[in-house]
Amino acid sequence: MNAMNPQHENAQTVTSMTMIQALRSAMDIMLERDDDVVVFGQDVGYFGGVFRCTEGLQKKYGTSRVFDAPISESGIIGAAVGMGAYGLRPVVEIQFADYVYPASDQLISEAARLRYRSAGDFIVPMTVRMPCGGGIYGGQTHSQSPEAMFTQVCGLRTVMPSNPYDAKGLLIACIENDDPVIFLEPKRLYNGPFDGHHDRPVTPWSKHPASQVPDGYYKVPLDKAAIVRPGAALTVLTYGTMVYVAQAAADETGLDAEIIDLRSLWPLDLETIVASVKKTGRCVIAHEATRTCGFGAELMSLVQEHCFHHLEAPIERVTGWDTPYPHAQEWAYFPGPARVGAAFKRVMEV
């Protein structure tokens, strides 16, 4: 998968990295480049994070730059808002995206609104990292994908990478950005490529093939989608883990699908979406989160508004079920290639 127009400082060596390693590299680089960057959250210091994304950073930069926080998501986000308003660039980790709800008031009423409320006198340049989605059989309290909750909040950016290269470049771009950012990290992709079919554990000690990632500083532009698979028959709008499911579905059906990895969910790269749908005349939207009021509903609305006269078939949406994320039946909940491929065939039959 190719990032669009990556901003490299100069030519540099590359290393095979998992997404965890790429995220750690991004934080390492930014801690070294900018003394205003601080990293904190539950267990991110001495322990290195529950998924080891921050492993070794406290030892390298000290307890004043990388430190643990109490089990209080509201307190973590509230502290980050204050730090950002007074000149720091906090990078905080919410241990699981499912845990963020107690911090909703701090995120929505404070972080997202402070620039507006102060007429631009204060900014909140903080990045909130959150592991999301399934992949660890964590059940309803360790598997949610709450992106739709954040994309409707004016003043927040919402980002979700699908590969190590984008994860590093996007995280660096988010940390340098002056807006508060929700940075969602699909757990199923933490430790290696996902073929769309077979579940794999994401424990830090599991070894899987990784991707080639530049060792040094680079940025992937925010608000730009990536066409990861060009095609002419139909457009697939997706992000995160579902990028790989869409690719598997295209391979299995043999259809010439154009797969777009949104990467930045909000602000959205509407230009790329509209150009693709007008070209293909058909659109399938796929995400892991629940269906009702999910982000796919907004995507459907935008495609309908901007591409109505170019559509050759009704828009299809493939999502998780409108139930809590199950424990033992995780794979039955997850929208796999069979369901996505069936949607491909339906839009082609019209």
Swiss-Prot record:
Documented EC number(s): 1.2.4.4
InterPro entries: THDP-binding, Transketo_C/PFOR_II, Transketolase-like_Pyr-bd, Transketolase_C
Protein's name according to its UniProt entry: 2-oxoisovalerate dehydrogenase subunit beta
Class in the EC hierarchy, top level: oxidoreductase
Catalytic activity: N(6)-[(R)-lipoyl]-L-lysyl-[protein] + 3-methyl-2-oxobutanoate + H(+) = N(6)-[(R)-S(8)-2-methylpropanoyldihydrolipoyl]-L-lysyl-[protein] + CO2
Task of the protein: The branched-chain alpha-keto dehydrogenase complex catalyzes the overall conversion of alpha-keto acids to acyl-CoA and CO(2). It contains multiple copies of three enzymatic components: branched-chain alpha-keto acid decarboxylase (E1), lipoamide acyltransferase (E2) and lipoamide dehydrogenase (E3).
Any GO molecular function: 3-methyl-2-oxobutanoate dehydrogenase (2-methylpropanoyl-transferring) activity
Keyword Oxidoreductase appears in the UniProt entry: yes
Pfam family, one: Transketolase_C
The protein's required cofactors: thiamine diphosphate
Keywords annotated in UniProt: Oxidoreductase, Thiamine pyrophosphate
GO biological process: branched-chain amino acid catabolic process; response to nutrient
Subunit structure: Heterodimer of an alpha and a beta chain.
